[in-house]
Amino acid sequence: MGASDKFIGFVMVLFRIFVFGYYTTWVIITPFIVSDHWIQQYFLPREYGIIIPLVLLVVGITAIGTFLGLVMIKSKKNK
């Protein structure tokens, strides 16, 4: 494993920690903060807290299903 692989992995972990912290703050903490507070300007409307993960879930499941379907079709052609 080269140094570039470790660096890319480290950057991905840092990005994931940032996304987790941002999403957790957005969904769990901001509903208890007054809506005209300055911190609210850094977050999308709360509806997107549900819409974005649902869209990602649907896209992910579709990609996995498509991949599995293509693998099954390809394996039948080889027989």
UniProtKB/Swiss-Prot annotation:
**Which ranges does the record mark as transmembrane?**
8-28, 50-70
UniProt keyword Cytoplasm present: no
Task: Write out the pathway annotation from the protein's UniProt entry.
Answer: Protein modification; protein glycosylation
Which Pfam family name is an example for this entry?
Answer: DPM2
UniProt keyword terms in alphabetical order: Endoplasmic reticulum, Membrane, Transmembrane, Transmembrane helix
InterPro entries named in the record: DPM2
Naming one, the record's GO cellular component terms include: endoplasmic reticulum membrane
Q: Where in the cell is it found?
A: Endoplasmic reticulum membrane
Main localization category: endoplasmic reticulum
Q: How does it sit in the membrane?
A: Multi-pass membrane protein
Single GO molecular-function term? enzyme regulator activity
Signal peptide positions (record): none
Which GO terms of type biological process are on file? dolichol phosphate mannose biosynthetic process; GPI anchor biosynthetic process; protein glycosylation
Q: Which family does it belong to?
A: Belongs to the DPM2 family.
Q: How does it assemble?
A: Component of the dolichol-phosphate mannose (DPM) synthase complex composed of dpm1, dpm2 and dpm3.
Which PANTHER family does this chain map to? DOLICHOL PHOSPHATE-MANNOSE BIOSYNTHESIS REGULATORY PROTEIN (PTHR15039:SF11)
**Protein purpose:** Regulates the biosynthesis of dolichol phosphate-mannose. Regulatory subunit of the dolichol-phosphate mannose (DPM) synthase complex; essential for the ER localization and stable expression of dpm1.
Name this polypeptide is given: Dolichol phosphate-mannose biosynthesis regulatory protein
